[in-house]
Amino acid sequence: MMTTLRKLPLAVAVAAGMMSVQAMAVDFHGYARSGIGWTGSGGEQQCFQTTGAQSKYRLGNECETYAELKLGQEVWKEGDKSFYFDTNVAYSVAQQNDWEATSPAFREANVQGKNLIDALPGATIWAGKRFYQRHDVHMIDFYYWDISGPGAGLENIDLGFGKLSLAATRSSEAGGSSSFASDNIYDYVNETANDVFDVRLAQMEINPGGTLELGVDYGRANLRDDYRLVDGASKDGWMFTAEHTQSMLKGFNKFVVQYATDAMTSQGKGLNQGSGVAFDNEHFAYNINNNGHLLRILDHGAISLGDNWDMMYVGMYQDINWDNDNGTKWWTVGIRPMYKWTPIMSTLLEVGYDNVESQRTGDKNNQYKITLAQQWQAGDSIWSRPAIRVFATYAKWDEKWGYDYNDNSKTNPNYGKAVPANFEGGSFGRGDSDEWTFGAQMEIWW
């Protein structure tokens, strides 16, 4: 009897400890990719992206190890009210050695409070650094609506016919919209705070299986006292987005139209940029002035074509028209069909084509890329991960123009100017050539 009594406190302590561990359970999410590759002409794997394009077809065409590690926890809950703490640390290295040191990027640290306002059931208050309602095309790793950064907002306000979200974020800019003192002493600063104010109305059901999302973003350079922008700087801009999502063929199709002005045209995703740093009050990076407009028409999706076939696809036209004639027109189209031999083994073929025309020279850069991959994945969907794949990639390109990146922006007043491929000073264009690579890669998200 005494032995039993002596064991009781220990049992209670162990049970309490187990309950504490359960109560403090941490959510672990993330993403990672890594591998090894070779180039047909020798050396490590090369990756291929058209000069002037903002992304590339990624299957068998990623040359880095990249990871995002997310830790989060619901730290308080009472009824339907709760607080959630979320973090995200990202790493990227060149995958060339065993020991590759890198400084982590602290990409997310935020708290989200749900159902805290009785008058707005279902709404969430949040503050901190956050990936905020990002919209992307997975197969080209292209984010076309992404205002992520430090910020605050109120999201998912139920209006009956849709959900309203309001947010403000910041993206400080090195160079870009840099400023200097208004007196005769030019005190160049490294960063200028760029503010973005975002309004979205989503989940509006407008047809069977179809929803509409509308958004408007305003971005501005927020100057310090007694400072002014460099002459010719793009001070602010707007971006308007309409996206229709249709459920179809066990997947989805998204059709997107976006229009942006001035400071919102450089990145074209909802974050603004201004002008480059002035040097000696006369030398500028040539691409500082982004006054003008952007028009983007995009269609992409992922569908099932039967028991054994899935497919991703994208088609996009983007026109950046700048007052300084340094804009581009970018066409891209690609498909990634997947044939499933078994629920965990598949073959993928990715074919992508890019064409980028220089507004200044009228010349075009084009590239097509073909990748064949054999893959083993955790499930029978094109989205199933983790995946291990072996691949072979062939790319062929013909580039007629590039950018003048000779010397540096302090000494070259035309730094960043679009120039023909035969520009005497040289340019960042790749000429007419082709190459093939092969290797193996893992990819996972959880």
UniProtKB/Swiss-Prot annotation:
Induction: By maltose.
Major localization class: membrane
Family annotation (InterPro entries): G_neg_Bact_CarbUptk_Porin, Maltoporin, Porin_LamB, Porin_LamB_sf
Leader sequence residues: 1-25
Compartment(s): Cell outer membrane
Biological process terms in GO annotation: monoatomic ion transport
Keyword Transferase among UniProt keywords: no
TM annotation in the entry: none
Task performed by this protein: Involved in the transport of maltose and maltodextrins.
Protein name listed in UniProt: Maltoporin
Species for this entry: Escherichia fergusonii (strain ATCC 35469 / DSM 13698 / CCUG 18766 / IAM 14443 / JCM 21226 / LMG 7866 / NBRC 102419 / NCTC 12128 / CDC 0568-73)
